[in-house]
Structure formats: C-alpha cells, structure tokens
Amino acid sequence: MGGSAVQVINASEEHTFVLNEDALSEVLMRDEVKDRFVCVVSVAGAFRKGKSFLLDFFLRYMYSKYVHHDATDWLGGESDPLEGFSWRGGSERDTTGILMWSDIFLHDYPNGDKIAIILLDTQGAFDSQSTVRDCATVFALSTMLSSVQIYNLSQNIQEDDLQHLQLFTEYGRLALADTGKKPFQRLQFLVRDWSFPYEAEYGALGGDKILKRRLEVSDKQHPELQSLRRHISSCFTEVACFLMPHPGLNVATNPKFDGRLQDITPEFKSSLRSLVPMLLAPDNLVYKEISGQRVRARDLIQYFQSYMNIYKGNELPEPKSMLVATAEANHLTAVAAAKELYGQLMEEVCGGTRPYLSTAHLQTEHLRVKDKALFQFAAKRKMGGEEFTEKFRKQLEDDLEEVFTNYQAHNESKNIFKAARTPAVYFACAVIMYILSGIFGLVGLYTFANFCNLVMGVALLTLALWAYIRYSGELSDFGGKLDDFATLLWEKFMRPIYHGCMEKGIHHVATHATEMAVGGGAASYRSQTSVNASNGKVKRS
C-alpha cells in the first residue's frame, strides 16, 4: 500500500476550517485523474466509532480490485496488520478536519466512461473539543462533496441520530443553490455493533427492514417527527442501511490490537465481504453529480473552494445545540409576551383613540408600563441561566425603547398646536413681510419694500403648496422638508422673539400691577387717616 492520508481541510483551534488547496490540487490534477468523472465515498458520524478502521478495509478492496485487478481474497491474510488511514483504539479522537486518500483509484467501463474513485475520512462529531458548528460544517461539507455519504452509527438508528442528520444536512442545503432537485445523492446508514439479529438479520436486507421502520411516516406520529422524516427523504436521492455485528471483544478491549483478521469475529468479516463490494464494486459506483451534471476531478477542486468560502463567511446561520435552541425559543417567547403586554398597556395610555399627552406625562407612563413588561419577562420560567437571560433582557429593553419612539411620534401627531405650526409660521412670515413692505414704502425704501413683497409672495406660495401636499398626500417627502424648515424658522428666529416679547410684556404688566398696588395702598392709607382725623374732631366737639 503506497498511498497516504492527505489533509485537505484543516481544523484549527479557533474552530475554523482551512482548505489545503496545494495538497488537493496535487491529488486531483494528475494527468491520469483530472479529466475523469469522480465517485466520492465519505464516512461521517460520531467520534471513536470506527470510521477510519472501516475505511482501511475499503482500501484493501480498492487496491485488490483496481490496482492488482484481483479481488478474490481482498480481505488479506489473517495476520496482516491493518494499514491506511490513521486509527487507534481508545476514547480520544484521532482524525481532525477532512482527509483524502492520496491514491485515486481508476476504472474504465466497456462503454468508454472513465471514473476516478476518491475516499474521504472525516473528523468525528460530538467530541469534547468540537462545537456544534464544527460538527455541522464537517458533516455538511462531506455530504455536499460526496456521491455516497456513509452515516456511521453505533448499535441502532435512534431519534437523536435522525435529528442530528436533519440539522447537518439542512446546514449543507442552506449553502447550495435551490435547483428544485434533491441536493444530495446516496445516504448509506451503517449501523455498527448491531445486537438484535433476531429482529433484523445482519446486512442490507435487515438494514432495509430497520430503515423502513425508522423512517416510516404515519398519522399517529407527532407532526415534528413526520417533518423530520420527510426532510431526510427530500434531501437524498437514495437512502439505504446496512447492519454490522460487533467485531469482537479482542478488538474492543485489547490496547495492542492492530487490525489483524485473526482477532476479528467471523460474522464481522462476513459482513465486510458483503458491504464493501456493495459500495465499491464497479457496477455499484455512484457518479458524483451536481445539479444533474457529472463532476470531473478538476471541477471538484472548484466546488471545494466555493463551499469552503461559504462556510468561512457569515452567510449561514449559526447552528445551535438542542439546549441552546430550546432556551433561545423559550426566551423569544417570553420577549414576545412582554412586548405584547407593553403594546396593550401603551395603547390604553396613548393609542389612536386617546388624546394628546404632554412629553413628561408620556415618559412617566412609558417607564411604568416598561417596568411591568420587564417584570413579566423576569417572572417567566426560562432555560439557559442568568447570563443567557440577561442578553435577552437587554434586547427587550432596546426593543421597548424603539417601540416607545413610535408611540412618541404618534402622540406628537395629535398635538394640534404643533400640527398648525407650519401654516402659522408661513402665514406669520407673509403678514410680517406685508407690514414691513408698507413701512419701507412709506419712507421711500422701495428696494427693501420690493424684497419684502417677494418674500411675502414666496411665503404665501409655500403655504399653498403645503396645504396641497397635506390634503392630497402627494410629495410627502417635500412636505416633510417644508415642515422641517418651518420648525427651523420657529426655533431659531420666531420663538426667541416671541419669548422675548412675552417676557417684556409680563415684566411690564407685573411692574404696572406692583405700582398700582403700592399707589392704591398709599391712597387708601391717606384716606383712612383723613377719616380717622375727622372722627376725632367730631368727638372733641
């Protein structure tokens, strides 16, 4: 065996994946390979479940069949150690990223078709160092790039296995353009260590029996379970299953086990003799197709690059664990309920049928209602812990402030004085200019008088245009600019003058009233003194 495993996609400690383009091109751009159609066989699944171990038996068959052209006894000698993709016993992961076997196996069909067979090994899912995104990315990439995706499972096809498959394949489907066709080709469930041969025999027939049971859709099922099964069927053009026995205690418990057939049970070896040709014999190879078109080896490089660019960017949503997804949905429900309560209470305060409120009063009511909404959010029982909840609480506060901004604008629209400000400003400008024009005309300053007449005309035309926009609903953007300009005139010029005049007027009235009060008091005092004096004279007489 002269080939080796080539790391074509590297996994970094920062939970990112990098394409090794040079290594990929070196394998696929060989003269004898690049123009051939490809069959890509990939094995994916949970870590430490024997994926690389299985692939090395695939390699034995490939070298026997396609290199030495003699597959009579392809399993090899009983004492030959297993070589190929790196594997070992134990509980820690061994493979990271995606590996490709450097030897590409070639086959020419009698009809002239030429095919290149590629084997991929993938990083195991659900180890202690991989995030959900890591697992989803590796599984999705291998599914998108392969024509046969082997889903390696332990002991049974369980509901959580199907849920993970749904998540990972949907993550892959999001990255592909929707062509209206099923996005992936063959999915091969491979159930390892099957312990119930009395229910379903080892091999493809027993696997089909179990697969039919697991993927069956019935009216008695919950809609969520029905949807999951329909999703899997909609993603793959072909779905099959194969049941394999346990390879034996010597394989599982011997730390020095190196893959020798003498340590493996006869049942396992018999299953290998059925499984491997079923997938890799010339008549059973599946051409890699994308959008119904067969893919050549040189084109596969472009697909590697395109798919990696998608997963390196931010175009796809972040896949989440079931706990995080449930907790997020739980919090979003609580946020929606709190926002609904805020909206109901604010409608009672300043809704469409309520009168205008002062800014201070509206702000007070907003704070009161906001506290009620936040209290309801806090009172809801939620998953995820305090830190998770705090993120959504802050988001809720921001959302409520944004909603309050809309209520403020709606409330201001009810202010009849503010609504009348624009026409009042332009009319006042016209009146002032008319008066100034008359004054300038009387003193002979006709240039200034004409200018005032011009400004008066512009103000009246603007007023007429504003009225047309207001009641016709057309040119609303320009109408908003007229309102803004009127507000500017009021705030910068007319309001200061108005306030100055009001202050002077109030000061004058207050001064006059004080003088009147003081003058009236003195007169009253003098009158009272005079009366008292008169009374005294009367008494003395």
Swiss-Prot record:
Chain residues that bind GTP: 48-53, 192-193, 251
Binding site for GDP: 48-52, 192-193, 251
Disruption outcome: The gene is essential with only a few escapers. Flies display a short life span and are sensitive to mechanical shocks. Following bumping they undergo muscle spasm, followed by paralysis, delayed spasm and finally recovery. The sensitivity to shocks increases with age.
UniProt topological domain (Cytoplasmic) ranges: 1-424, 470-541
Superkingdom as given in the UniProt entry: Eukaryota
Record carries keyword Calcium: no
Reaction it catalyzes: GTP + H2O = GDP + phosphate + H(+)
Membrane-spanning residues: 425-445, 449-469
GO molecular function annotation: endoplasmic reticulum-autophagosome adaptor activity; GTP binding; GTP-dependent protein binding; GTPase activity; GTPase-dependent fusogenic activity; guanyl ribonucleotide binding; identical protein binding
Domain GB1/RHD3-type G: 35-284
EC code: 3.6.5.-
Keywords linked to the UniProt accession: Endoplasmic reticulum, Golgi apparatus, GTP-binding, Hydrolase, Magnesium, Membrane, Nucleotide-binding, Phosphoprotein, Transmembrane, Transmembrane helix
Phosphothreonine found at: 514
Record keyword Protein biosynthesis present: no
Gene Ontology CC, one term: endoplasmic reticulum
SUPFAM superfamilies on file: Interferon-induced guanylate-binding protein 1 (GBP1), C-terminal domain, P-loop containing nucleoside triphosphate hydrolases
One of the GO biological process terms: microtubule depolymerization
Pfam families: GBP
Function: Membrane-anchored GTPase that mediates the GTP-dependent fusion of endoplasmic reticulum (ER) membranes, maintaining the continuous ER network. It facilitates the formation of three-way junctions where ER tubules intersect. Two atlastin-1 on neighboring ER tubules bind GTP and form loose homodimers through the GB1/RHD3-type G domains and 3HB regions. Upon GTP hydrolysis, the 3HB regions tighten, pulling the membranes together to drive their fusion. After fusion, the homodimer disassembles upon release of inorganic phosphate (Pi).
Subunit and interaction comment: Monomeric and homodimeric. The homodimer, transiently formed by two molecules on opposing membranes, is the active form mediating ER membrane fusion. Interacts with spas; interaction may regulate microtubule dynamics.
Domain notes: The GB1/RHD3-type G domain mediates GTP binding and hydrolysis as well as homodimerization.
Listed name of the protein: Atlastin
Native organism: Drosophila melanogaster
Gene that this sequence comes from: atl
